[in-house]
């Protein structure tokens, strides 16, 4: 009962598994994994398929579990990393290319992250020249966030990087393009 409560399934404990939604089945799998209080818990994309409220609950559960056990989280969801991890490793082609703290991966992109307002008429050329980490369309122009290690142009505005910027910076450092 206690484990079902942790994963918010106590009210559904009498349902057959086939009657559970995809997110509920995922939470049931986590309940099975923590049932015998393992010293190491390995979870793969644990919040995929969960609604936003359950995603937050589950991130908090992982953070609490990590207080007295090792939790290995495999995910592509940056929000999961930001909410639950102190240390992380980045794999590329089966090799560890980074092992450190979340602050260290963010720091790796510091000084290389810019916001630039690009006229729509120039966006295609801009995409070919720079690593764009995000963009937002404002009609006549597109506000882009880029990684760039060369001398910045006058319209480039330096901004603080995120974990995602640090991750992309690592990938381009090891054999990427546009730098």
Task: Describe these PLM feature segments.
Residues 5, 67, 111-114, 172, ...:
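Residue-level marker of structural boundaries
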Residues 1-73, 78-92:
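ABC transporter nucleotide-binding domains
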Residues 130-179:
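C-terminal coupling/interaction segments
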Residues 11, 120, 148-150:
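Non-catalytic surface loops within mature trypsin-like serine protease
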Residues 58-145:
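ABC transporter nucleotide-binding domain
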Residues 4, 59, 106, 164-168:
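Conserved protein kinase catalytic domain
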């Amino acid at each position: 009962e206690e484990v079902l409560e942790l994963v918010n399934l106590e009210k559904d404990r009498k349902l057959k598994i086939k009657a559970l939604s995809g997110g509920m089945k995922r939470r049931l799998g986590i309940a099975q994994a923590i049932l015998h209080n393992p010293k190491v818990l390995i979870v793969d994309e644990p919040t995929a398929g969960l609604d936003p409220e359950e995603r937050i609950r589950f991130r908090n559960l992982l953070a609490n579990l990590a207080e007295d056990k090792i939790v290995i989280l495999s995910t592509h969801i940056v929000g999961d990393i930001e909410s639950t991890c102190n240390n992380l490793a980045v794999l590329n082609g089966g090799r560890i290319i980074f092992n450190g703290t979340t602050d260290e991966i963010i720091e790796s992109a510091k000084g290389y992250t810019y916001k630039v307002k690009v006229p729509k008429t120039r966006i295609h050329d801009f995409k070919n020249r720079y690593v764009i980490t995000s963009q937002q369309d404002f009609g006549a122009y597109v506000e882009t966030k880029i990684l760039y290690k060369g001398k910045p142009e006058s319209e480039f505005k330096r901004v603080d990087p995120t974990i995602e910027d640090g991750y992309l910076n690592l990938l381009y450092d090891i054999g990427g393009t546009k730098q």
